[in-house]
């Protein structure tokens, strides 16, 4: 009788597992399909401009007319990539705001709005260009695009430590933490020319800036030396976390892809981060800039403040974002102003 009961319980357990595993597999397949859909819907800045007929440029920045743009070219491939040579003519209706060269390179001169037209062999195409001093830089837009592209491409698949990002950075097998390496890979892919902290020129007028440092602390040191380690997030900035339990200031680094100002110093921040549970993850959380830690040093770390919180549950609307915090003992240390 006892043996029969044990066999019955075992069969019931096996039946439950058979029901559970197909359901889990189906859920994972649905998630992968959603990742693939998001990837197919993702648009580079130029592609978005072609579709919408609108483009934004930060004052002083340049970008090719969307329809002739070569796309987002990694820095280490730019030398071998020819400049566009489109047929036809370009013109701006307000050169005090935007000028355009004969090959379609638009340059933002001053805040305002201008319409740039391309008279091509196939007919006229027009783009309304908005210029502003506070807009995200062109390379910042590219960086956000690349980060999202990598996130949707990896689709939360588990990666080895010696993955495509580590291979690109180290050029030889090296199994180490790769959160900083992931940011450098994406920065290069976006067109940044990452530099070593040791090569930093404190007198140089850097505009767009990224550090080729596989150690999180070295990235922080570089931004901090230039006064570009800040307490307010912007898309395209890096974000460095502090371990409150150990008071370790540079425990991990990710990158900001979206920011929503909620008022009173509170921001909803969305990030893409490598080397989280051996994959690439996206997080969305609330950050309180009134409790910024960016000016804390090793001598003053006893004053570190907790400044992260979960969004209200009713705002957990994107199945591809993680709304649960990384841990219960991390806080934002600060943000690296890459542009």
Please annotate each region the language model reported.
Residues 1-39:
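Gram-positive cell-envelope targeting signals
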Residues 26-135, 269:
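Extracytoplasmic soluble-region selector
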Residues 132, 257-258, 287, 334-339:
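Short beta-strand-to-coil "C-cap" segments at the C-terminal boundary of structured domains/repeats
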Residues 132-195, 336-338:
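N-terminal capping segments
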Residues 144, 268-269, 332:
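A residue-level signal for beta-strand positions that form part of recognition/binding surfaces
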Residues 193-281:
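...with weaker cross-activation on analogous glycine-rich loops/strands in unrelated enzymes
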Residues 274-299:
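Glycine- and charge-enriched low-complexity intrinsically disordered segments
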Residues 290-339:
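Low-complexity, Gly/Ser/Thr/Pro-rich intrinsically disordered linker/tail segments
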């Amino acid at each position: 009788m006892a043996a029969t009961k044990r066999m019955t319980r075992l069969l019931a357990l096996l039946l439950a597992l058979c029901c559970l595993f197909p359901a889990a597999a189906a859920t994972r397949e649905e998630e992968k399909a959603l990742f693939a859909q998001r990837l197919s819907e993702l648009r580079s800045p130029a592609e978005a401009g072609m579709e919408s007929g609108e483009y934004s440029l930060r004052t002083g920045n340049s970008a090719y007319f969307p329809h002739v743009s070569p796309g987002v070219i990694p820095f280490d491939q730019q030398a071998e990539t020819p400049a566009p040579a489109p047929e036809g003519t370009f013109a701006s209706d307000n050169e005090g705001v935007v000028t355009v060269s004969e090959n379609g390179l638009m340059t933002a001169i001053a805040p305002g709005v201008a319409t740039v037209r391309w008279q091509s062999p196939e007919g006229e195409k027009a783009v309304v260009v908005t210029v502003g001093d506070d807009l995200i830089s062109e390379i910042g837009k590219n960086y956000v695009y690349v980060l999202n592209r990598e996130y949707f491409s990896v689709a939360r698949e588990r990666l080895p430590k010696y993955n495509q990002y580590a291979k690109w950075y180290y050029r030889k097998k090296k199994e180490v933490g790769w959160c900083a390496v992931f940011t450098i890979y994406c920065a290069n892919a976006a067109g940044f020319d990452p530099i070593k902290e040791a090569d930093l020129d404190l007198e140089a007028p850097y505009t767009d800036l990224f550090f080729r440092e596989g150690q999180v602390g070295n990235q922080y040191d570089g931004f901090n030396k230039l006064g570009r380690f800040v307490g307010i997030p912007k898309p395209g900035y890096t974000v460095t976390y502090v371990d409150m339990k150990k008071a370790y200031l540079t425990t991990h680094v990710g990158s900001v892809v979206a920011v929503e100002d909620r008022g009173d110093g509170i921001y909803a921040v969305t990030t893409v981060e490598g080397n989280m549970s051996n994959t690439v993850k996206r997080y969305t959380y609330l950050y309180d800039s009134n409790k910024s830690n960016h000016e804390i040093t090793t001598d003053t770390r006893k004053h570190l403040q907790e400044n992260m919180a979960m969004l209200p549950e009713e705002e957990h609307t994107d199945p591809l974002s993680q709304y649960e915090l990384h841990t219960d003992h991390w806080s934002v240390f600060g943000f690296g102003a890459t542009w």
